[in-house]
């Protein structure tokens, strides 16, 4: 359930962002298009940097225990419909995921590729964004005894370092978006 909601959420977020921004920038050409597209990518990049800074400052300090979000505790007990809804909400509404998906959609909108290229790009992004989740789910389903201890250690490491990992990802994504935005000008 969670994985289905996650994949649908990723596809919906990137597709909707691409569609809306394509409609907004579609009739524009020349200087107007370059200004709007450049500012759009700069805004996505700067927002990613702001969120990265917030995540870095909110990370647990040495000696303090990190807290998993409250939604993470209820995933295992959720029925398939609730798990799907949770996956969809997390893929579309979490600040980091929203920025990464909106950035991908914005890039697809301003690049103006053919429809089939957009379709394949969105599907590729959904596969990549879901692959780690799929590995964990398949591992638990088919080899729970073998993967439980390593995944437990991984979860402990993520608890301690999640803020730093998210900050690094958002810094890189923000840098790419800013670079694209500056390149358009």
Tell where the protein language model's regions lie, with residue ranges:
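Hydrophobic residues within the alpha-helical transmembrane core of Major Facilitator Superfamily
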Residues: 4, 49, 88-89, 127, ...
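Structural signal for alpha-helical transmembrane segments and their flanking helix-loop junctions
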Residues: 1, 69-134
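Alpha-helical multi-pass membrane helix bundles of inner-membrane/thylakoid proteins
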Residues: 36-40, 47-95, 152-168, 185
């Amino acid at each position: 359930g969670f994985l289905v909601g996650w994949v649908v959420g990723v596809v919906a977020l990137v597709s909707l962002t691409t569609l809306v921004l394509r409609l907004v920038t579609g009739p524009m050409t020349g200087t107007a298009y370059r200004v709007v597209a450049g500012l759009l990518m700069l805004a996505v990049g700067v927002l990613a940097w702001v969120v990265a800074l917030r995540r870095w400052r909110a990370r647990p300090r040495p000696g303090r225990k990190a807290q998993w979000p409250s939604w993470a505790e209820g995933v295992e007990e959720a029925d398939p419909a609730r798990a799907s809804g949770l996956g969809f909400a997390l893929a579309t509404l979490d600040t980091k995921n929203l920025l990464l998906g909106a950035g991908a959609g914005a890039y697809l909108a301003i690049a103006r590729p053919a429809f089939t290229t957009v379709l394949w790009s969105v599907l590729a992004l959904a596969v990549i964004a879901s692959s780690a989740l799929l590995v964990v789910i398949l591992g638990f389903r088919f080899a729970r005894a073998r993967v439980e201890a390593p995944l437990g250690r991984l979860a402990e490491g993520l608890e301690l370092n999640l803020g730093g990992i998210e900050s690094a990802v958002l810094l890189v994504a923000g840098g790419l978006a800013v670079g694209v935005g500056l390149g358009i000008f």
